[in-house]
């Protein structure tokens, strides 16, 4: 699953806005928005932070 889809999926499962996810990841709303639209790709550090956030919140991606 591409990172864009993972971001949208995680937000849906946790019922979070882009702003709320951004706050949890330590980035801006605009950054999450660009990631989800595919206009930017998270750095490795932010990708690891997102993966940790998902693990802590028990978000599981099928077919990972």
What are these regions (language model features)?
Residues 16-33:
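Short alpha-helical DNA-recognition segment
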Residues 44-64:
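DNA major-groove recognition helix of helix-turn-helix/homeodomain DNA-binding modules
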Residues 12, 23, 55:
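Short polybasic/polar patches that bind polyanions
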Residues 1-13, 51, 61:
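A short, Lys/Arg-rich alpha-helix, primarily the initiator
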């Amino acid at each position: 699953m591409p990172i864009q889809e993972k971001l949208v999926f995680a937000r849906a499962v946790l019922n979070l806005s882009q702003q709320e996810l951004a706050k949890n990841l330590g980035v801006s709303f605009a950054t999450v928005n660009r990631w989800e639209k595919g206009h930017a790709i998270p750095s490795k550090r932010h990708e690891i932070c997102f993966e940790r956030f998902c693990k802590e919140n028990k978000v599981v991606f099928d077919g990972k």
